[in-house]
Amino acid sequence: NLEYFEAEGEAAFYGPKIDFMAEDAMGREHQLATIQLDFVQPERFGLTYVNEKGEKERPVMIHHATLGSIERFMSVFIEHTAGWFPFWCAPEQIRILTINDAVEDYVAKIEAILKDITLEAPLRHNDIRYRVDRRNESLGKKIREATKMKIPCILIVGPKDVEAETVSVRLHESEDTVKLADLAEYIKNLK
């Protein structure tokens, strides 16, 4: 159930409309989606159609903006998520952090798994967007930077992971250890 109200006198001059409003973090309302009936434009453009009786009639035009202004939608979305996009729409979904060069062959196995993943609809045919951070920096610095970039999934790979055939996973609000054999299924289930 959606909360709604009638705003008499606020409708556009060309006919009634429905606005879908979203509230930002400061309590301000923003119009996002809208749908409206337009009785004016068809007349201005001289639009007609022939009805089932063979008579000319004036159509009613329907305007709609599914998201409203894309800029307005994105600003409300970014603010609402505080920049922590859901996994499926994050520009960079995964950052792989290496502890040292000794894990390179193991990272190649992880990359092969990521390249093989087929995401479910609506994401089918989307490749996993990831990057490997091989820089000779401290792990703490790499984690801080990836977190600051709000990357939803951080995979940490060190010698202990290679030995145990696991991957250390950091999500926005949790940490986990995943067997390499289970990594593809784990990634597919991220939201």
For the regions a protein language model found, what residue spans apply to each?
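NTP/phosphate- and nucleic-acid-binding module
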Residues: 1-191
